[in-house]
Amino acid sequence: QRQMCIRDRERVEPMGSQYGKKAYVNGLLIALNVLFFLYLEITGSSEDAYFMYTKGAMYAPAVLEDGEYYRLLTAMFMHFGIRHIMNNMLVLFVLGDNLERALGHVKYLIFYLLCGIGSNWVSMMAHTADTMTVSAGASGAIFGVVGGLLYVVTINKGRLEDLNTRQLVVMIFFSLYLGYTSTGVDNIAHLSGLVIGIILAIILYRRPKGDRWPNGGII
């Protein structure tokens, strides 16, 4: 995030069989982000703070004083420049599929949206006195995905598909480090997204019985 001035009858298969399962929702989310970015570039400039504000980026006074709550959602699909969207979509592409297969299509969509909206809300409340900040980006939701995966991997004996706990912890550490040593980064959105993701994973995820993965896990 950047700122600018289940239980029915189940057939069980080994965990590795889940690699072939399609993560449709994650692909759709990436496509929506890219399409919105292209729209912004065609109609204006995604690096112009005022233009981004007019298109639905986060701006605390607009939400709190004018009731424009839709910004909590629209800002999740907006990015400031090509590097911003490329970095976020690369992480979502690499990690999102894993969590979607673990949660299921519907739960994953709910999870992602709640992480993004929730992190935007927390960030907004932390910047209520800041009338000069316009923010946008999917990284609050993406940090939520990382947090959700951290919980899921941890309770699955430290491993899920090709991910392990150590990889995720290192990723979280370096992502937060880069955020706190860079300018124009909404670290509050990142941290809150991470925490919200862990909480939602605790609520939504159900660990398969034994060491095997339920084929009916995708809904």
Residue spans for each PLM region:
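Short, small-residue-biased leader/transition segments that mark boundaries at the very start
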Residues: 1-6
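A detector for small-residue-rich transmembrane helices and their helix-helix packing motifs
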Residues: 7-219
